[in-house]
């Protein structure tokens, strides 16, 4: 008996259908509050230093659509505003008692660091291919060696200090931004949909489709055209499948972080002949994303097979009761085969439905009002 990743919310004894909805409310509250704090932290210093005109320019840069990696101030605020998705969803899951936050990480209720380390080999292959494809035609070779082709790219429009600051900031912050999006779209959202739908296979399909659609729609404000949205959607679709196939977010966090870091670093010099504000995707770009994502999935599957990865939670789902879960159950799992009892269940009192449990410690009998309602 085991539980797939998208049903992990069903493992905790306190599961109720309304808890994810309550968690969404808490999540939005924390996230919106954090956006206010971030706005104050960035806008106030800019207003003091540059005045109203500086604030207006900053606001225009933030709302221009495509993200400009050559402006460290705008880039830092944008990335941090996404990074806070992670503590917001952590707080929501904990406050609403959906179970341990680690269950969003994997079926082992934690980050599987050993498995993540094994995913570095497929990631390295992906990195070489992505950098090669995205920088194709931008290098030239002459007597002095290999260097950027300025005839194609133009000249860098940023100083060495700005370039260094941008790259350091991207390398340090973008992995957390990528992880935050994975926990929200491929973690919380997929587990919510999967827990609501009683049929596991149907739930898996719907969870993948819904998370992919929401992920793609979330990028519409960036000004992407149809090919750009298809590009993002293809990435999200295959990432969702990888999560279900591996039972965790580790592989997709690495893939997402690599994708974003590569894009930002290659654009950081601000080449004069490259329009970094252009957000229109192309069918060629979509095919590259689709092909590299499929390749990464295949390599991850191979590594998972060779390493004997545990893809499912080694336990059972909490049975569905007609009434309130027993007071002594708390968050304990239903652990005995066939749903014959709660772990750590105290002795049953007269008139309480269910099997007689052995006396546990000095807890005493359960009160009649807190007994287990009859199972369907």
Regions found by a protein language model. Give the residues of each.
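Membrane-helix interfacial "entry" motifs
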Residues: 11-19, 66-74, 107, 111, ...
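Interfacial aromatic "cap" segments that immediately flank transmembrane helices
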Residues: 24-25, 110-122, 202, 253-256, ...
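N-terminal, membrane-interfacial amphipathic/helix-forming hydrophobic leader that caps
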Residues: 1-100, 276-376
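Hydrophobic alpha-helical transmembrane segments of multi-pass integral membrane proteins
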Residues: 81-92, 120-133, 209, 213
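Juxtamembrane helix-loop-helix connectors linking adjacent transmembrane helices
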Residues: 76-79, 101-180, 190-191, 195-198, ...
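Short hydrophobic alpha-helical membrane-anchoring segments
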Residues: 31-47, 51, 90-94, 127-139, ...
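Transmembrane helix-loop-helix hairpins at the membrane interface
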Residues: 166-324
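Residue-level signature of transmembrane alpha-helical entry/exit and packing/kink sites
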Residues: 16-23, 74-78, 82, 115-119, ...
